[in-house]
Amino acid sequence: MKEALKKIADQIPYPIGKLLGKTPMSLRLGHDYQTFNKLTNASFLSLRNSQLEQINKLIQFSRHETVFYRDHLKEKGYNHKSIEAFEDIPSIPITRKSDFQRYTLDERSVRRLALKKSNTGGTTGQPLDFYLEKTAYAREWAHMHAIWATLGYRYTDEKITIRGKNIGNRFYKYNFNQNEFLINAYAPLQENLDACRELITKRNIRWIHGYPSSVYSFLRELESVDALLFEILISKIQGVFLGSEYPAPQYRNYIEQHCGLKSISWYGHSEMAVLAPEREPGSGVYYPFHSYGYAEAVPDGDSYRLVATSTHNFATPFIRYDTGDLIDPTFKDGLLECFRIKEGRNSDSVIDKNGRSISLTGLIFGRHHQAFDHSEHVQVRQPAPGKIEILVTSKENRESWAELFDFSNAFFDVSFTQLESPVRTPLGKVQLLLR
């Protein structure tokens, strides 16, 4: 039923879809949606107790039902039958993507509990297939709606969604399941201005949702092409939901300060082991949902690694799974309370002439380069250690971009290339570091 809804959701005409869109989420996603919706508001103590209980169940189940965990736990010398407290969890061996990749999907999974196959890691060069559990959609959307509700969102509200979905030659199409208008991120706005004007003026759009880079590109292009239409849209919008990418300061400053819009971001990943929204919109501090999974900050030299357990997925268990992200954590009573992303799983860093790993967040966004006043996007490519190529997307014709960047005291040979449009992934994301 849930999969069928997804397949037909963007084929139903707006007038019919608008009526269907009023159907309560509990009827679309079943009783599980209500259950998770209640869990998002459960008491801290009950959620912590539930986490411990679920982790115990997951370990025993995985050890008996999957070849991978039977081997993995034995190989690491873990033979405890149960854990009594959170202090016992660090004794459970950490699992990395490379560990999973040594085994087939069937050896890591219990197929009878699966809803569908999913995958992750396409941009990191480490693909991994896994199964989502049958309650995955209910779990995901109950928590996503809880995040958006902090800005006032209701599921009957209309929104624009700007990501990388291929919708053919159309500028937009309606998807009743999320009551959203999917914008074609690849379609030139100038050539589709009439369709854009019809959408903005005739529909009651209250929210924008999408990749930060895509939302930024759309709003900036609209402002340059039709300033009046831009103002009309901004006057309607109550907030912006920034997902699937790290919201780079350049993008967020434009959305919040220039456009005057509230925004909220969250940390999540395809494996669905941890979901952590901002409690204070715009803060960049993420608080994991205890009703979604169990998140830890595990020391790694001078840093901490984000490790997570998907407490609800018994189809392909993820137990103490290394997400690949480095974080700056805050602890409460010895447990992870919240965190900032220090270095992402996509390893957005480059190697300088001295062989040191340099964070691109600081190198590009921490130096207040004047180039940001003259460009739409800045991306980086590293052809060799000590060398970086700066790719600038701009409508200005400049002979030299070097004077607008400050790379003083940085040990790199820097070259510059100007582009008409940014380099995007197959899904339409604009990544800072190109590989």
Predicted regions located by residue number:
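Conserved AMP-binding/adenylate-forming
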Residues: Q238, L242, P247-D333, N346-S347
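Conserved beta-strand termini and adjacent loop/short-helix elements that scaffold enzyme active sites
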Residues: I162, W266-G268, V298, P383, ...
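Conserved adenylate-forming
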Residues: K165-V285
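Conserved beta-strand segments of alpha/beta enzyme cores
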Residues: N179, K262, Q379, D413-S415
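Residue-level signal for inorganic ion chemistry
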Residues: S62, T120, K159, I208, ...
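AMP-binding/adenylate-forming catalytic core of the ANL superfamily
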Residues: I208, F314-F412
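Nucleotide 5′-phosphate-binding alpha/beta core
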Residues: M1-N119, Q126-W141, H145-D157, K165, ...
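Conserved beta-strand elements of the Class I
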Residues: E158-I160, V307
